[in-house]
Curated annotation (Swiss-Prot):
Chain's role: Part of the gene cluster that mediates the biosynthesis of the brasilane terpene glycosides brasilane D and E. The biosynthesis starts with the activity of the terpene cyclase braA that converts farnesyl pyrophosphate into the sesquiterpene alcohol trichobrasilenol. Subsequently, trichobrasilenol is glycosylated by the O-glycosyltransferase braB putatively using UDP-GlcNAc as sugar donor to yield brasilane A. The latter then undergoes two rounds of oxidation performed by the cytochrome P450 monooxygenase braC.
Keyword vocabulary terms for this entry: Metal-binding, Repeat, Zinc, Zinc-finger
Listed name of the protein: Brasilane terpene glycosides biosynthesis cluster protein D
Compositional bias ranges of the Basic and acidic residues kind: 209-226
Highest taxon above the source species: Eukaryota
Length: 245
């Protein structure tokens, strides 16, 4: 049981040495000196060092001892209770002590980029609502608009961003004909979507009815017309046909 623990401990030691060497924490000269120390130790497991096994089914046992807690320098890890530690592993407990004074650097954290906020008057942005024809700024009267309502010298002049252009470039007008901006203006303000207009044909028909009272009266249903029609069908001796006729 002790030999198995020693073998596992040696394997961990070699793995740790390889990791330290690969990470650049120890030099190749230091690595060679440690390996030479392990090879020169008469109690080392040569089968593990050379990758060969001198026994057919068993590993060569190594010397092991129980480590006295007082022998371990302060600040180094202590072995667990009743845990046999190999002499080689105990000799390597001081490995990396020269690095113990280095300050541990916290992992670098990546801050999320803040979303662009509305520019202030310090940037001399002219109000896009005031600048765009046919629009008025609702916040200017309340004194809440952060933009200039004047042609400030050196101010950024851009109209509102076209709603349809911002929505996947769906504007049917060219950049020259559209009164809104077909580019990401610095103020980042997009024009609202136009409201649906009522049909001109519907408005014109209603206006025509109002201008012709007789025509409007004819379009309205009068119950007296039904009574007159019933009298005509009775005089002809036939019933009035159904509505689906």
């Amino acid at each position: 049981m002790s030999s198995d623990l020693v073998s596992k401990g040696m394997a961990q030691v070699f793995t740790g040495l390889g990791i330290l060497l690969g990470a650049g924490r120890i030099s190749s000269e230091t690595h060679e000196e440690i390996m030479a120390l392990l090879s020169a130790d008469p109690g080392s497991n040569t089968g593990i060092m050379t990758g060969t096994n001198t026994g057919s089914t068993s590993i060569i046992p190594t010397q092991s001892k129980r480590v006295d807690m007082g022998d371990i320098p302060a600040g180094l890890p202590r072995p667990g209770k009743e845990t046999p530690v190999s002499i080689q592993s105990h000799d390597l407990l001081g490995l990396g002590a020269d690095l113990s004074t280095e300050a541990v650097q916290p992992p670098e954290t990546f801050r999320a980029q803040a979303s662009p906020s509305a520019p202030s008057k310090e940037l001399k942005i002219i109000c896009p609502w005031w600048l765009t024809d046919g629009y008025s700024c609702r916040e200017h009267d309340q004194g809440k608009c952060p933009f200039y309502h004047d042609n400030v010298a050196g101010g950024v002049k851009h109209p509102l961003i076209c709603h349809f252009w911002a929505d996947g470039g769906r504007c049917t007008k060219s950049q020259k004909d559209c009164r809104f901006a077909h580019y990401p203006a610095p103020h980042r303000v997009t024009a609202p979507m136009p409201s649906k207009k009522k049909s001109k044909k519907l408005r014109s028909s209603v206006a025509d009815d109002a201008s012709h009272p007789d025509l409007g009266k004819a379009r309205r249903h009068d119950p007296r017309d039904d009574e007159q029609n019933d009298e005509v069908w009775r005089n002809q001796g036939r019933a009035r046909p159904g509505q689906e006729w």
